[in-house]
C-alpha cells in the first residue's frame, strides 16, 4: 500500500508541475496588456499583473531600453495604466508580487511582456500575390515594401496577437521588401504591416493601409485567416499537453491494477500457508501408521524355574497325595495400543502358540511326578 501511495503522489506532483509550468510557474505572476501590446504613439495601455498565490501588491520594472522615471519602483494593485506612451515606453517589462503582511519579500519575476510603440516612421505598402481575392486552396503571398531602409517587417492580422516578422531585402526597383507566404488560402482576413530598425526593434513605423484578403467559395471569408504557423503551433502545444496527461492517467490506472493484483496474490498465498501445517500433520500420522505394517507385539516370558522332584519308590512316598506343582509366567505390563486388523490377527496367533507352549510345559511337569513303576 505504501508503494501505491508513493506512486499516486509522484503522478500528482508531475501533473501539477506541468499545469503550473503551462500557466507561468509556481510563484511567478502573469503580466499582460490590454487592449494590445502594440500601442500607437500617444496612446494608452493597461498592464495587468495577476497571481494564483494571492499576491495583492505588485511592482513593475523595465528590463531594457530607456528607463521610464514614472515607473521606477512603481507599486500598484493588480493593474496600472501607462500613457500617453512615447518611444521611451517601448521595451520589455516584468512584474513581481508580494503580500501586504510582508512587503519586503517579493516573488519571482513574471513572464516578459514586450510593449511596442508605433507611428515613429512612415508607413510601408502591403500587397497580395496573385491578388486580394483568391480561390479556396490557392497559395497567397503578402508583400510588404517601402523606400525607407527598414531592417525588419512585421505582419499583423486583425484580431490576432501574433505578428510574424521577416528581414527586409533590397529589391530591383529600389525598395526594401519582405514576402510573407501564407500557404493555401482557406479563410480571409484584414492585414497590415510595419517596418522597424535593428537599433530600436520595439519602435515601429505607422501601419500600412489595411489589406482585405477574400477567399471565394467559402461562406466565412472574413471570419478567420489563411493557414498560419501560429495556429498550428498552438494546436500542437495543446495536443501534446492532452497526450501527456492521457498517458499519465493510463499509466496510473495500470499501476493501480498491478498493485491490487499483487496484494490479492499475497493474501491468497498467506491463506494457503496457514492451511498447510494441519494437513501435513494429518498426513504424517497416517503415514506413521502405514509405514509400520510389520510391527508385532511380543510376549516376553521370564525364565521358568522348574522344581526338581526326587523320584522315590512307592514305599517311601507319603500316604497323602502329592501336591501338584504349578508353573506361572509373568508377562510385563504393556500399554494397550490400537492395532490394525493384520496386527490383531498376528497377535492372536502368537497368544495361541504361547498357550499351547504353556500347556505342553505343564504336561511335561505333571508327567515328571508320575511314579515310576518297578523302580
UniProtKB/Swiss-Prot annotation:
Positions of the UniProt region annotated as Disordered: 213-233, 334-375
A biological-process GO annotation: immune response-regulating signaling pathway
The keyword Signal appears for this protein: yes
Ig-like C2-type domain: residues covered: 42-102, 137-200
Pfam (any one): ig
Keywords: Cell membrane, Disulfide bond, Glycoprotein, Immunoglobulin domain, Membrane, Receptor, Repeat, Signal, Transmembrane, Transmembrane helix
Topology relative to the membrane: Single-pass type I membrane protein
Keyword Transmembrane recorded: yes
Source taxon at top rank: Eukaryota
Disulfide bond sites: 49-95, 144-193
Segments traversing the membrane: 239-259
Location(s), subcellular: Cell membrane
Residues annotated as signal peptide: 1-21
Stretches of the chain found on the membrane's Cytoplasmic side: 260-375
Function per UniProt: Receptor on natural killer (NK) cells for HLA-C alleles. Inhibits the activity of NK cells thus preventing cell lysis.
PANTHER family linked: KILLER CELL IMMUNOGLOBULIN-LIKE RECEPTOR 2DL5A-RELATED, MHC CLASS I NK CELL RECEPTOR
Protein name: Killer cell immunoglobulin-like receptor 2DL5A
Species the sequence originates in: Homo sapiens
Amino acid at each position: 500500500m505504501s508503494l501505491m501511495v508513493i506512486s499516486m503522489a509522484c503522478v500528482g506532483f508531475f501533473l501539477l508541475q506541468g499545469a503550473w509550468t503551462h500557466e507561468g510557474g509556481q510563484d511567478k505572476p502573469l503580466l499582460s496588456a490590454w487592449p494590445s501590446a502594440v500601442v500607437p504613439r500617444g496612446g494608452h495601455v493597461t498592464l495587468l499583473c495577476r497571481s494564483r498565490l494571492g499576491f495583492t501588491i505588485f511592482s513593475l520594472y523595465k528590463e531594457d531600453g530607456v528607463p521610464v522615471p514614472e515607473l521606477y519602483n512603481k507599486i500598484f494593485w493588480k493593474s496600472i495604466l501607462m500613457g500617453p506612451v512615447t518611444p521611451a515606453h517601448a521595451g520589455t517589462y516584468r512584474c513581481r508580487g508580494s503580500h501586504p503582511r510582508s512587503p519586503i519579500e517579493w516573488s519571482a519575476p513574471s513572464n516578459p511582456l514586450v510593449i511596442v510603440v508605433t507611428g515613429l516612421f512612415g508607413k510601408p505598402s502591403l500587397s497580395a500575390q496573385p491578388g486580394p481575392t483568391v480561390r479556396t486552396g490557392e497559395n497567397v503571398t503578402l508583400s510588404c515594401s517601402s523606400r525607407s531602409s527598414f531592417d525588419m517587417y512585421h505582419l499583423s492580422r486583425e484580431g490576432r496577437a501574433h505578428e510574424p516578422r521577416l528581414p527586409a531585402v533590397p529589391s530591383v526597383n529600389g525598395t526594401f521588401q519582405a514576402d510573407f507566404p501564407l500557404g493555401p488560402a482557406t479563410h480571409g482576413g484584414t492585414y497590415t504591416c510595419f517596418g522597424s530598425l535593428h537599433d530600436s526593434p520595439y519602435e515601429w513605423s505607422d501601419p500600412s493601409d489595411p489589406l482585405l484578403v477574400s477567399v471565394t467559395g467559402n461562406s466565412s471569408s472574413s471570419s478567420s485567416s489563411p493557414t498560419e504557423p501560429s495556429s498550428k503551433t498552438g494546436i500542437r502545444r495543446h495536443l501534446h499537453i492532452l497526450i501527456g496527461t492521457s498517458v499519465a492517467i493510463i499509466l496510473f490506472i495500470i499501476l493501480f491494477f498491478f498493485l491490487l493484483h499483487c496484494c490479492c496474490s499475497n493474501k491468497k498465498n498467506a491463506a494457503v500457508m496457514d492451511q498447510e501445517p494441519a494437513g501435513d500433520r494429518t498426513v504424517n500420522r497416517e503415514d506413521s501408521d502405514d509405514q509400520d505394517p510389520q510391527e508385532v507385539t511380543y510376549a516376553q516370558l521370564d525364565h521358568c524355574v522348574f522344581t526338581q522332584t526326587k523320584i522315590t519308590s512307592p514305599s517311601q512316598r507319603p500316604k497323602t497325595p502329592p501336591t501338584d506343582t504349578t508353573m506361572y509366567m509373568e508377562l510385563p505390563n504393556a500399554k494397550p495400543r490400537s492395532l490394525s486388523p493384520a496386527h490383531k490377527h498376528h497377535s492372536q496367533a502368537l497368544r495361541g502358540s504361547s498357550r499351547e507352549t504353556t500347556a505342553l510345559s505343564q504336561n511335561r511337569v505333571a508327567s515328571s511326578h508320575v511314579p515310576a513303576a518297578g523302580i
